[in-house]
């Protein structure tokens, strides 16, 4: 029986009713799984949640390439490439390139005559990302992988080929417009953050590198979660937002199953991500919580305003002082050092001209006025970006499922 004649009944809860002329076929009838290794000289490819299959060096990627490139799999244009561990996040796509990908990916050669661009949009649409999550198995979110047997049965939604091409043309054009708008707004956010940084540098930068060492103004704390009776929230530290509850910035569960060894921080404590301190990853805890045992938890002496101190430590001059003191393998430049960390002892050797409490309060007030204005603009811009991204995802879903006739709106 020709696989081109194989169709399946529509009983798929995550897809809308079929449009006239549209069909469903199982993935196994359209693709053949192939594992073609031992091609170390081919270019490296990777699958990104936001970009699909692209050259690995075209995007920032924290995953290290294995020394033995012979274990990587060769794929060709039109092949379906799936990151089995991250399919539920959207790390799936039809490759437009020839190259090699991780040996842990699932690679399928095409055995069909459908439009590759349409299939790429389809496989990366919200309904299909939802389907990958349904077909993934594991201990918990963040540690799952797609079930191979279930994946082979994935129903593929197929309009006539001429409609596929029209959908691909429409989405190429419309998403490019949205992406341009999003990029403009992202550049605006970057510019606003630079203005924010410049305001802090202007107000406090000159106080760095003179007067007394920081050790006279800070106390390091090391209280562990298993030493306190409270059930405290997990906190995270970022370069952009400082210290926040982890559940406010990511839906992923904690990587560590046992958090009993995590450090306790109290509201107003200074928390430093020691691996990213030289990039400004520090801030004041907005509430009691627990943080990674690798973080440093510090408390300012009573005569030092914690908000003033955190602002001073995020100035460009102070961050540069920290960068000079990191210890790790490699260079601190652009975060290239492997396992870079700053020791609290080295941190406390940095000099800081701490004024009297009244002057601290005045400087904090001036900075806060500027920060509040800029932060409002950043929030408004980021909300606009989020709405544009939601619009983009909804447009893709509507097009690939036939909820809009792209030939009428083209």
Q: What does each model-identified segment do?
A:
Residues 6-13, 85, 99-106, 139-165, ...:
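A short glycine-rich beta-alpha junction/loop motif
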Residues 8-12, 25-77, 215-227, 231-267, ...:
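Sequence-specific dsDNA recognition surfaces
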